[in-house]
């Protein structure tokens, strides 16, 4: 039954991908505030992108779900490991598919355009119930970022950190992410989330550890899920390590992933969004 349900979900998400307005990544060369540069498309993880696909909504509709992708400050060594600016990975294809899945599979009011690109130190954060951060292994939280992000999270906001890989004990990406979270919440512990945690069963019943890592050719470990919680035990920061659910989202309509992994990624995204709006 589980295989049948997964197959049905996979067919559903592939069907709604056709109307979601998927925008292909375009080539180009972009200079960012930190002086880093990124070139055009390249078929390796964390590459490609261009200035043409950076866009802003005319306004934020307060009656529907709109979430924000974070543009954050980077560690100075980021360019040694990836050609694309890390916060940009899977943008905007994954961002389009995420709200499209909410529109198709739930009663949440959303459209494929229900996302925004927001700077981490901007007060615009407080307009959105849900933040998405790509490749947090390269994150560098400055003093202004720390205050803004902590205020946002302590007022009930939710942050999903996704798309980084390696070994938990000696991987620079995981170690750096953990150091940044200790700066953000020195009084709170980053803990593994068990498979029976409510966030995995809120809307869909998901077996989170029954996923293949998206970058197996790079000898990444198995997918792991961590969380930082508030005093009431609510997850404020959700961390998908050795996983990349946005990569699975954007691959839904191009046949580059299995139905099981794509379906599970969609289910996780739906659960995360509903959790963010109800906790």
Listing of model-derived features with the role each one plays in the protein:
Residues 9-17:
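Hydrophobic h-region of N-terminal signal peptides that target proteins for export
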Residues 22-30, 37, 47-49, 75-79, ...:
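An acidic, glycine-rich "communication" segment
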Residues 17-130, 136-137, 244-245, 251-279:
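Aromatic-Pro/Gly-enriched surface loop or interdomain linker
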Residues 67, 130-174:
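Short alpha-beta junction capping motif
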Residues 1-7:
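Sec-dependent signal peptide recognition
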Residues 95-99, 146, 150, 174-178, ...:
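Extracytoplasmic/secreted envelope proteins and their assembly/folding machinery
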């Amino acid at each position: 039954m589980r295989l049948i349900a997964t197959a049905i979900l996979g067919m559903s998400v592939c069907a709604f991908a056709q109307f979601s307005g998927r925008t292909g990544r375009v080539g180009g060369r972009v200079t960012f505030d930190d002086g880093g540069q990124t070139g055009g498309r390249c078929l390796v993880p964390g590459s490609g992108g261009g200035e043409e696909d950076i866009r802003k909504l005319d306004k934020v509709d307060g009656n529907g779900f709109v979430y924000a992708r974070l543009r954050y400050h980077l560690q100075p060594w980021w360019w040694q490991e990836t050609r694309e600016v890390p916060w940009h990975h899977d943008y905007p294809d994954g961002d389009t598919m995420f709200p499209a899945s909410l529109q198709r599979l739930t009663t949440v009011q959303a459209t494929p355009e229900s996302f925004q690109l927001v700077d981490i130190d901007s007060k615009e954060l407080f307009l959105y119930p849900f933040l998405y951060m790509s490749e947090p292994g390269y994150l560098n939280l400055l003093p202004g970022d720390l205050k803004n992000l902590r205020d946002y999270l302590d007022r009930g906001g939710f942050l999903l950190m996704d798309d980084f890989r390696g070994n938990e004990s000696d991987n620079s990406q995981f170690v750096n992410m953990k150091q940044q979270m200790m700066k953000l919440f020195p009084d709170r512990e980053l803990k593994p989330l068990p498979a029976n945690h409510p966030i995995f069963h809120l809307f869909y019943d998901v077996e989170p550890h029954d996923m293949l890592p998206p970058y197996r050719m790079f000898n990444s470990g198995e997918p792991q899920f961590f969380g930082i919680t508030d005093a009431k035990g609510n997850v404020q920061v959700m961390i998908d390590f050795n996983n990349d659910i946005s990569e699975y989202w954007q691959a839904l309509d191009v046949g580059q992933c299995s139905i099981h992994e794509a379906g599970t990624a969609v289910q996780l995204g739906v659960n995360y969004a509903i959790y963010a709006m109800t906790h």
